Amino acid sequence: MEMTRTVRAPRGTQLSCKGWQQEAALRMLMNNLDPEVAERPEELVVYGGSGKAARSWEAFDAIVKALRSLEDDETLLVQSGKPVAIFRTHRMAPRVLIANSNLVARWATWEHFWELERKGLMMFGQMTAGSWIYIGTQGILQGTYETFAEAARQHFGGSLKGRLALTAGLGGMGGAQPLAVTMNEGVAIVVEVDEARIQRRLDHRYLDRMTRSLDEALAWARESMAKGEPLSIGLLGNAATIYPEIVRRGVIPDVVTDQTSAHDPLNGYIPEGLSVQEAAKLRKADPDEYIRRAKASIVKHVQAMLDMQKAGAVVFDYGNNIRQQAYEEGLKDAFAFPGFVPAFIRPLFCEGKGPFRWVALSGDPEDIYKTDRAIMELFPENQSLRRWLEMAQKKVHFQGLPARICWLGYGERVKAGLKFNEMVASGELKAPIVIGRDHLDAGSVASPNRETEAMKDGSDAVADWPLLNALVNTAAGATWVSIHHGGGVGIGYSQHAGMVVVADGTEEARVRLERVLTTDPGMGVVRHVDAGYEKALQVARERGIRLPMYE
């Protein structure tokens, strides 16, 4: 392990590769491992328990070397974080194709994965860790903001003002929660076992305060709720201890969820009664005992969530598979509360809406502020988008290369991409822009306990859709395309695909952008048409998507 090595993406217009498409892949790989961005960069872990950018430092170095020598008509193949081949393809083909953590269905278990990982044959890519498009906590912030906003609309008249949200986990994903709640005018108590993670969110202004005392956290929360003021509190502790204690005291939060790394009971979730350091020792000394204790804690954690739901709280699973883990340990009504996608997000997916993100390769925040203005001018009628961008400018701390995210739908993404390409071509932006997204998107994931939970036609587990998404984006000329397994919810529970396309100001980039930013969100609309959603069919007809079964 190379404890002292620091990786940071180059900035500016000087190329170290043979073209901007390759340079973009190189910089985004390096950006994933920037200490400002990654959770444990010395171990190549970006976020999500054990989501890595490369399999080993040797593999990382080989990827960097390959990208620097890659021609404009060649494609690099990466298998679970290791570069395995370079083939001559053509200029409009992707420069990199990535497959991470994919296992044949019968062997798709954490136990088999860990065995392969120990042998150095595989790595866990999460969603955007192994596909080189993680942008830090902002990457999930707008989705988290939209989720809490929709909960507020459905249950609390449109705002969380004077309301308490209880959640846990301040890692790369969960770290967005406190700011998302305060952006919705609410009060958040976020339980986190790792003090360093709480400190990081304080440093980045995602979190307002920290305490070790539940009494103090509740006192602060009550005071802010009474005044109708937003406040976020990081509470040092274990959710498996704190949640049941809150139930015991008869305190009923308005909203309850969780974003601990419960999807991974070995490398993610920390059992009750252990410090981070003690957990690390037990994990190494007796992994089976560690998993047993983690799962017992998860059962207590979920039982408390069920108790709060019965007492009147709005409770939802925030996509970490915690219900499944508890169910497998014998908690039979673990699925009594819904996942966040069917509860709040699916109507957006029917329009091909999802987390469109972009990164300024110049390293200059001003390039992002210029693109913010361009987006507001492109969609002047979208007031919630304007509100989001204005809030993001004030409150979001850039991690690594400056980046932005906003949810855009079919027809909108292509307009944005072409506008960015024009801005690069004219010199308004100092360097090219990288455009990507989370794998959590409308048409790029099969995950029956998360994105495709409770599909109208029962097609929750059909994994053809993310594969078609990757294939069509490859055909359309994305700069790099990835197919992953297990992201978000753990090995055995999801299949998903990612794409990145670069706006470098050229005519070639314009063609790529026009195709990819149409096919990619188009798959989201099509997937939901096929599942029987009327809204998706209406969108497809209005916007001219060809559907052979409807022609």
UniProtKB/Swiss-Prot annotation:
Its EC number is 4.2.1.49. Its cofactor is NAD(+). The active site is at C406. NAD(+) binds at residues 48-49, 126, 172-174, 192, 197, 238-239, 259-263, 269-270, 318, 488. GO terms for molecular function: urocanate hydratase activity. Binds 1 NAD(+) per subunit. One of its GO terms (cellular component) is cytoplasm. SUPFAM superfamilies: Urocanase. It catalyses: 4-imidazolone-5-propanoate = trans-urocanate + H2O. It is found in: Cytoplasm. InterPro entries: Urocanase, Urocanase-like, Urocanase_C, Urocanase_central_sf, Urocanase_CS, Urocanase_N, Urocanase_Rossmann-like, Urocanase_sf. GO terms for biological process: L-histidine catabolic process to glutamate and formamide; L-histidine catabolic process to glutamate and formate. Pathway: Amino-acid degradation; L-histidine degradation into L-glutamate; N-formimidoyl-L-glutamate from L-histidine: step 2/3. Keywords: Cytoplasm, Histidine metabolism, Lyase, NAD. It comes from the Bacteria. Catalyzes the conversion of urocanate to 4-imidazolone-5-propionate. Belongs to the urocanase family. HAMAP family: HutU. This is Urocanate hydratase. It comes from Symbiobacterium thermophilum (strain DSM 24528 / JCM 14929 / IAM 14863 / T). The lineage of its organism: Bacteria, Bacillati, Bacillota, Clostridia, Eubacteriales.
